[in-house]
Amino acid sequence: MADQQRGHNTSDSRRKSLAGKRTSQQTPTSSLSSGGVSMAAATTGTGTASPCGACKFLRRKCVSGCIFAPHFGSDQGAARFAAVHKVFGASNVSKLLHHIPVNRRHDAVVTISYEAQARLSDPVYGCVSTILALQQQVASLQAELSVVQSQLINSRVAMANVMQQQTHHQQQQQQLVVMQQPEYSNNSSASTTLAGAAMNSFTMTADAAAVSYDVMAPTNLEHSLQPMPPHQQRRGDYQHEDEEESGADFSVAVGSTAVASKVIFPAEDFHRR
């Protein structure tokens, strides 16, 4: 009887051990299945199949409401976030973005990324080197602009001086023309007056000469040889006085003619001298 009881106990213990082994084999599979469900829930909670670039670089799970997800995509966000994390640190950037309004965070991330890239390329000046280069370029452009403006002002002043000289020269020419016109008219009137006086005196002298020629005719000469009555002698004296006056007029006419010729033709007299 005792042997039967011992065999029954050993069989029960074997059954219990097998049952324990089975349960131990089933628990890992159940834990794996529950972990897969939780991972699926996590992925569905973020709404994206892959984590953002920041979480991918940090090798952490991208939870819902990740502050880096809207600004660092999954494609190139990891490289951008690497520079930001190396220069500023992920925790500092996260704190900075939390203190900035949502509508201004994108601009902040762009500037932070640019500053990080500039700091990595130029550890001494960083983005200040770009600012200095732009300032130097602005200064050089302002200097060129000032030179061009001064040249433009000088050209305008020169053009104004040329125009003023031209107008002054034209005014002088007009004044000379106006001043020469009255002189020419006065000279012409004076010359015509002198010429007319000379012609009148010349005609008078010619008439007197004709009269004297008639007196010297042969017929008149015979009568002149005869004694003349006293009244005719008086007439002869009067004629002699008239002839002397006509001779004086002729000399005056000749002198006036010479003066008129000098006035009308001054160049000839000048050449003769």
UniProtKB/Swiss-Prot annotation:
Example of a GO biological process term: jasmonic acid mediated signaling pathway
UniProt superkingdom: Eukaryota
Positions of the UniProt region annotated as Disordered: 1-39, 221-248
Annotated LOB domain residues: 50-152
Bias (Basic and acidic residues) ranges: 1-15
Organ and tissue specificity: Expressed in roots and flowers.
InterPro entries attached to this UniProt entry: LOB, LOB_18/20
Similarity section: Belongs to the LOB domain-containing protein family.
PANTHER family in the cross-refs: LOB DOMAIN CONTAINING PROTEIN (PTHR31529), LOB DOMAIN-CONTAINING PROTEIN 20 (PTHR31529:SF12)
Protein name, UniProt field: LOB domain-containing protein 20
Lineage, highest ranks first: Eukaryota, Viridiplantae, Streptophyta, Embryophyta, Tracheophyta
Gene, per the UniProt record: LBD20
